[in-house]
């Protein structure tokens, strides 16, 4: 039922959290900041533009999240997580076949606090070249 499915999803997020924290070198940390949802972006390793393409996917996911009122954050170390034997086994378990590289984890949830005010714009940060 639904409860079992939710537990399964929570277990997967927890597994990804532990794997990411291990790469970070702080096994007890929560690099996902308590977010209930983690989207993993992968790209075919033989795609020479995989990091650029995957980065565009991450950016679009984060923009879409903002558009529907969700908070998001790009969490690194997906490459290291999915290059590990445990990560490769996880991909096989999910039915992902082929040689993929992890690009990023996009965490989603609702903010626990209000968003900080934007930083002031930097003067002379963008230059127009004619």
Question: Predicted regions span which residues?
Answer:
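Small-aliphatic-rich amphipathic alpha-helix that forms the alpha element of a beta-alpha
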Residues: 45-90
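C-terminal helix-cap and adjacent tail motif
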Residues: 96-130
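Helix-adjacent hinge/juxtasegments
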Residues: 16-53, 59
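Short, hinge-like loop/turn segments at secondary-structure boundaries
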Residues: 22-23, 89-93
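A generic local secondary-structure boundary/capping motif
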Residues: 28-30, 92-96
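Short, small-residue-biased leader/transition segments that mark boundaries at the very start
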Residues: 1-3, 7-8
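Short, charged/polar surface micro-motifs in flexible loops or helix N-caps
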Residues: 10-14, 45-47, 112
């Amino acid at each position: 039922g639904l409860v079992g499915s939710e537990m399964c999803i929570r277990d997967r997020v927890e597994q990804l959290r532990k794997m990411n924290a291990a790469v970070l070198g702080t096994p007890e940390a929560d690099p996902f900041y308590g977010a209930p949802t983690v989207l993993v972006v992968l790209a075919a390793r033989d795609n020479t533009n995989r990091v650029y393409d995957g980065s565009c996917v991450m950016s679009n996911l984060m923009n879409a999240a903002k558009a529907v009122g969700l908070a998001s954050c790009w969490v690194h170390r997906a490459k290291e997580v999915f290059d590990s034997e445990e990560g490769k086994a996880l991909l096989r378990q999910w039915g992902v076949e082929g040689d993929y590289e992890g690009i990023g984890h996009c965490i989603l949830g609702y903010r626990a606090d209000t968003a900080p005010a934007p930083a002031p714009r930097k003067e002379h940060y963008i230059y127009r070249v004619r």
